[in-house]
């Protein structure tokens, strides 16, 4: 049977690998040789699970959204990652990677962030574990996610605004990689999504897989079976999606639906719909689909959501799309915002703009009344209130 998980060479089918400058070979090799041994050790698992339980507040609830279920004609459960400490799924990964960094003797943590959720989660865990923390954030994102920038500073992190390119996530990642090249010995680079060179996509997916591990147990309790008919998640780099599908990825009974950012529409050029528009390329050390021009130059992506405007996609998801294991839908800005308002009015939950893209997929799908659908609400909407309000005023 075909497996959709990573192979021993760090590939998902033809996607993945580690295409890195020579100066980083040693760092990446050290990580590749160490990560499985550490994260599979009993001592690590015990500390990781204890922090997820007592500090993050896991397991996160699996909530039957009755009014939304009625509207879409199925049994719709929401996996509430928005209820974690720091308000999103990102902290599952930062706790795991910083525990790993500590075991590797690293003293300085660097991170990139788009919406600021990964930055806040990294700064939070660095404060908890007394580590130096430097976060690179595009100047555009510093402005549109001002509160998260201030939170990171309050937590003791140094926030460096990046002024190259579009001044968003891709540019912040470039700067973080540059920093890592300059300080390979004492620095650990913590990537917030299933992107970058192997072993990052696999490591992040494994650390986030706590999401689907809990879904299995929670469905067994609520429905008497441990699998849904469909899983729905938004995808930028793809870490919440990877965590949502991890334990179901090879289970053909479970349909996988991924929602990427359509922006102002895939035909407008103002979009981040990598699966719809991307061609094979290399970005940040991985071979995957990339939005690029005829000359292979990476195009600037656009999405109203700071967490989804990435011109690549995690290799795990590129492979799922190429093998037709996942159905990938592009959800435009207005569709996402409409879906966010709908969830807020029907269930009293204000989702992050990223999660709103997953919710926006619901109206493009047809369900049977007995279908069990699990949709991951990857984060809460506090950081996006201004965007929601200003979009509404423009209408």
Residue map of PLM features:
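Active-site-proximal loop->helix
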Residues: 110, 118-176, 267-278, 384-393
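Active-site nucleophile and cofactor-binding loops and adjacent substrate-binding regions
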Residues: 80-92, 109-119, 165, 208, ...
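Active-site/ligand-binding loops adjacent to catalytic centers
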Residues: 173-177, 181-199, 250-253, 258-349, ...
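Positively charged, low-complexity intrinsically disordered leader regions
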Residues: 3-16, 29-106
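Short glycine/serine/threonine-rich phosphate/pyrophosphate-binding segments
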Residues: 87, 91-97, 111-129, 143-145, ...
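Claisen-condensing/thiolase-fold acyl-transfer catalytic domains that form or cleave C-C bonds
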Residues: 235, 239, 333-392
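A short, small-residue-rich loop immediately preceding and capping a beta-strand
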Residues: 85, 101-138, 226-240, 256-259, ...
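Glycine-rich ThDP/TPP pyrophosphate-binding loop and its adjacent helix/strand module
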Residues: 170-175, 179, 186, 195-254
């Amino acid at each position: 049977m075909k497996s959709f998980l990573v192979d021993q060479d760090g590939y998902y089918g033809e996607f993945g690998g580690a295409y890195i400058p020579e100066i980083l070979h040693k760092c990446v090799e050290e990580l590749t040789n160490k990560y499985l041994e550490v994260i599979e050790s009993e001592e690590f698992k015990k500390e990781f699970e204890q922090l997820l339980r007592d500090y993050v507040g896991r397991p996160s609830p699996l909530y039957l959204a009755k009014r939304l279920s009625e509207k879409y004609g199925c049994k719709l459960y929401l996996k509430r990652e928005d209820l974690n400490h720091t308000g999103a799924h990102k902290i599952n990964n930062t706790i795991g990677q910083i525990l790993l960094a500590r075991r590797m003797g690293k003293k300085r943590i660097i991170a990139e962030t788009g919406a600021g959720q990964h930055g806040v989660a990294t700064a939070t865990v660095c404060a908890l574990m007394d580590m130096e923390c430097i976060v690179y954030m595009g100047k555009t994102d510093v402005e549109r996610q001002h509160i998260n920038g201030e939170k990171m500073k309050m937590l003791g992190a140094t926030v460096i605004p990046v002024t190259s390119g579009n001044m968003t996530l891709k540019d912040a990642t470039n700067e973080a990689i540059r920093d890592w090249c300059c300080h390979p010995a004492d620095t650990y680079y913590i990537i917030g999504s299933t992107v970058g060179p192997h072993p990052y996509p696999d490591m992040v997916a494994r650390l986030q897989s706590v999401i689907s591990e809990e879904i299995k147990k929670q469905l067994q309790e609520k429905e008497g079976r441990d699998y849904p008919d469909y899983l729905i998640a938004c995808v930028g780099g793809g870490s919440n999606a990877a965590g949502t599908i991890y334990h179901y990825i090879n289970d053909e009974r479970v349909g996988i639906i991924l929602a990427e950012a359509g922006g102002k529409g895939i035909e407008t050029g103002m979009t981040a719909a990598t699966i719809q528009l991307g061609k094979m390329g290399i970005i940040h050390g991985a071979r995957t689909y990339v939005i690029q021009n005829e000359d292979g130059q990476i195009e600037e992506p656009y999405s109203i959501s700071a967490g989804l405007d990435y011109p690549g996609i995690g290799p795990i998801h590129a492979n799922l799309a190429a093998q037709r294991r996942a159905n990938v839908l592009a959800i435009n800005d207005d569709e996402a915002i409409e879906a966010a308002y709908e969830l807020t009015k029907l269930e009293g939950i204000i989702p992050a703009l990223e999660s709103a893209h997953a919710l926006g997929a619901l109206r493009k799908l047809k369900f049977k009344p007995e279908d069990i659908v699990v949709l991951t609400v990857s984060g809460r909407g506090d950081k996006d209130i201004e965007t929601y309000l200003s979009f509404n005023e423009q209408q």
